[in-house]
Amino acid sequence: MNQYNVKYLAKILCLKTEIARDPYAVINRNVLLRYTTDIEYNDLVTLITVRHKIDSMKTVFQVFNESSINYTPVDDDYGEPIIITSYLQKGHNKFPVNFLYIDVVISDLFPSFVRLDTTETNIVNSVLQTGDGKKTLRLPKMLETEIVVKILYRPNIPLKIVRFFRNNMVTGVEIADRSVISVAD
């Protein structure tokens, strides 16, 4: 963990804060404009304070290396430690260091995406039904270890389908749905 990794991680944590405020918010790089971050870097534990610019809602994230986790909740705490790992692992709060080598959120390739609510999920599932109702078409899959799933995580709302939005010069905005599958241990 270094100061640059933590700065890039703070942008990802802004997106997690937006999901904590509204689990069905559309996430894209413009969400960063709604938040300010304050980083207190330390080798053992780094505190990242994410504050909403309008309502001043504050969330404090404690960031640890995977080798030295000593988590104690603080005021306005997110509720779980954020852990920088050496390789990709299960868990919404575990980010591999290779995710943090570049500023992925500000990249032009960073997608716009949203969690589908139960009504939209039922609509997608009904569209996937074939004529006889016995077989269903399947959506492309994505693993729960992908950064999009880590951002959209909410403990009380299971994530089944993620909708991606892509701009197309000819057709306008295209949508692409993907189903989330878990990784076996």
UniProtKB/Swiss-Prot annotation:
Keywords: DNA-directed RNA polymerase, Nucleotidyltransferase, Transcription, Transferase, Virion. One of its GO terms (cellular component) is virion component. It is found in: Virion. One of its GO terms (molecular function) is DNA-directed RNA polymerase activity. The keyword Metal-binding does not apply. It holds the Pfam family Pox_RNA_Pol_22. GO terms for biological process: DNA-templated viral transcription. The keyword Transcription applies. Belongs to the poxviridae DNA-directed RNA polymerase 22 kDa subunit family. This is DNA-directed RNA polymerase 22 kDa subunit. It comes from Vaccinia virus (strain Western Reserve) (VACV).
